UniProtKB/Swiss-Prot annotation:
Subcellular location: Cytoplasm
Official protein name in the record: N-acyl-D-glutamate deacylase
Main location: cytoplasm
UniProt key word Zinc: yes
Annotated keywords: Cytoplasm, Hydrolase, Zinc
Transmembrane intervals: none
SUPFAM superfamilies attached to this UniProt entry: Composite domain of metallo-dependent hydrolases, Metallo-dependent hydrolases
Activity regulation information from UniProt: Inhibited by cobalt, copper and EDTA.
Top-level enzyme category: hydrolase
Length: 488
């Protein structure tokens, strides 16, 4: 007698995440895993969900999140589930929920994570996640800035041999606790003062344990080519798998340089460097407000300000005019603060997106009072604007970029694909209507066209379970990890 299924999603078009053509099939789920795919019209099941001709796909994997502390503070994560995200990689740009800095040490970039205290080490961070249970799955990186702040008395200096060993030991402990790798934020301090020996030392620790290095590179403007090459060289010297975070070329003088940076990435891959990259599908970036940039970019919008919260959502130029000062002075008065910088070319973003090893990472900042719309709309924007409207890729190829590709790059076993035995992370969406609705002026509007989202077999959208959060902590399986030609 056939064992009963818990749920059958029937009447949909299945896209398995691996890039192949969609097919008409039912998906059967038992417990937390997919138990059957095919014609399940006669299969016994406790529940049936009529997909009504919609797309049934693997849940999306957000490769670049800053939700590190949100799993404890606001575990509902509606900004993720409402756009079909079932897993996220946190700890990016060199900052993470652990380890906590030594007393007296701090860094401006930590404000991106919010005001909650950090955890002493990654083991304690993961313990808190296990106790709280996230709504979606979480893979975590440990931040290089955190390592510096926790190991060095003067994080603005070069590490002593003892401090370098301490950072490497902390990294090894974090990887042992479950981190999938480490991240650098070389455009921020204190990571920006790190030199080759320091980065190579950490990358060797990661490589020896099958982990990876993701990097917010040192410069995304005039020196973007050199900054890309710097990180590729770390991977080449150490054998550490590498991800270039939110790759972009900022400022009009640098638009078009992605042709060179992508060519350099391809040459590195051909030479044996395991490298991938990600983008968010918008022509504006967002991070902390940096006064030194205020007179370099014409269009800057404030997302939050501690001394002037009333300025959230307003243009820096308008604020400066109202205050009767220049933009740099206004920015200094607003800090600590966050901002959106409109300095990217949409056509270039689209070119980068089409690279075969490019994934999608929202880079969303959930603590911002007036966030960048990428927080709520990145994945549905790809489906609606890049696929349906612009026809940059087939729907199947775009889904692969958001599912199987990141699962391979980050070594997330049995994720990112619809197959018997895989974890039941599933999104059901209408290919004809799916799109982002979040805008620069209304950045927290939920997406259109996402109809059902399941995490490990449990429905989390449109209605989250009242008392159960089904997410898991994801560890890296080095045996399946790597950008496509490096996967085993």
């Amino acid at each position: 007698m056939q064992e009963k299924l818990d749920l059958v999603i029937e009447g949909g078009w299945v896209i398995d995440g691996l890039g192949g053509p969609r097919r008409r099939a039912d998906v059967g789920i038992r417990g937390e895993r997919i138990a059957a795919i095919g014609d399940l019209s006669a299969a016994p099941a406790d529940r049936r969900l009529d997909a009504g001709g919609r797309i049934v796909a693997p849940g999306f994997i957000d490769t670049h999140g800053h939700d590190d502390l949100m799993f404890v503070e606001k575990p509902g994560l509606e900004w993720k589930t409402s756009q079909g995200i079932t897993s996220v990689v946190v700890g990016n740009c060199g900052i993470s929920g652990a380890p906590a800095p030594l007393p007296g040490n701090t860094a401006a970039a930590l404000a991106l994570l919010g005001d909650s205290p950090l955890f002493a080490d990654m083991a304690m961070y993961f313990g808190a996640l296990e106790a709280q249970r996230p709504m979606i799955n979480v893979a975590a990186l440990v931040g290089h800035a955190n390592l510096r702040l926790a190991a060095m008395r003067d994080p603005a200096a070069q590490p002593s041999a003892k401090e370098q060993r301490a950072m490497e030991r902390m990294l090894a402990d974090a990887l042992e606790a479950g981190a999938v790798g480490f991240s650098t934020g070389l455009a921020y301090q204190p990571g920006g003062v790190a030199e080759q020996a320091e980065l190579d030392g950490l990358a060797r620790v990661a490589a020896a344990r099958g982990a990876l290095h993701t990097s917010h590179i040192r410069n995304e403007g005039d020196a973007v080519e050199a900054a890309v090459d710097e990180v590729l060289a770390v991977g080449r010297r150490t054998g550490c798998a590498t991800v270039l975070s939110h790759h972009k070329c900022m400022m009009p003088a640098n638009w078009g340089k992605s042709a060179a940076t992508l060519a350099n990435i391809d040459r590195a891959r051909a030479a044996g460097v395991d490298v991938a990259l990600d983008i968010y599908p918008y022509p504006g970036s967002s991070t902390i407000l940096i006064p030194e940039r205020a007179d370099q970019i014409d269009d800057i919008r404030i997302t939050w300000s501690t001394p002037h919260p009333e300025c959230g959502g307003q243009s820096l130029a308008e604020i400066a005019a109202r205050w009767g000062c220049d933009a740099v002075t206004a920015a200094r008065r607003l800090c600590p603060a966050g901002a959106i910088y409109f300095a990217m070319d949409e056509n270039e973003v689209r070119r980068i997106f089409q690279h075969e090893c490019c994934m999608v990472g929202s880079d969303g900042l959930p603590n911002d009072a007036h966030p960048h719309p990428r927080l709520w709309g990145s994945f549905t924007r790809v489906l609606g604007r890049y696929v349906r409207e612009a026809e940059l890729l087939t729907l199947e190829a775009a889904v692969a970029k958001m599912t199987a590709l990141p699962a391979r790059v980050f070594g997330l076993a049995d994720r990112g694909r619809l197959a018997v035995g895989a974890w039941a992370d599933v999104v059901v969406f209408d290919a004809d209507t799916v799109c982002d609705r979040a805008t620069w002026d209304a950045p927290t509007l939920a997406s259109a066209g996402i109809e059902h989202v399941l995490v490990n077999g449990c429905a989390v959208f449109p209605q989250a379970p009242p008392s159960h959060r089904p997410g898991r902590i994801l560890r890296r399986d080095a045996s399946i990890a790597g950008a496509p030609e490096f996967s085993r």
